[in-house]
Amino acid sequence: MFIAFVAAAAAVASHQPPGAICVSIGQSNAADLQYICESERAWSRAVASGDIDAPTRILANDYVGIGSSGKRFTKAEMAAQPARTSKSVSYSDNDYVRVRFFGSTAMNQGRDSLRTKDGHTSHLIWTDTWLKRDGKWQIVQSQDAELESSNLAADNLQ
């Protein structure tokens, strides 16, 4: 989800809605939706706060992430990233998250805004695949891409 943190922060677009929107497309269990939405937000905010607990909790042990550069990441690598990114990122949060449930699988698509400490803003679009195993929701796969500022208006929740 947030694999290209610092590289993506070079974009110059500056847009942040007043609050993140997290919605279920189709039917969902309210408690599952709330947990996934809160977890996505915690992971995004960890980029700036340095909190390693959020990715450690929500990423499955067999997690594989693909960054916008094509690099693969494991759970251990992703859990360690907030400690590094928080040195250069001052703000990171979800703009929106769309969640689609398919039984014990949830597919999420979202957008995050990031701001570096030197004032550059960037946006990442991402997809996360969640599985509910042994009663616990965790991300097993994610992929992100930097959103060009010229495409920002076209990427909206409506």
Describe the predicted segments one by one.
Residues 13-57, 62-158:
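A beta-strand edge to alpha-helix "cap/lid" segment located at domain peripheries
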Residues 3-15:
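Hydrophobic h-region of N-terminal signal peptides that target proteins for export
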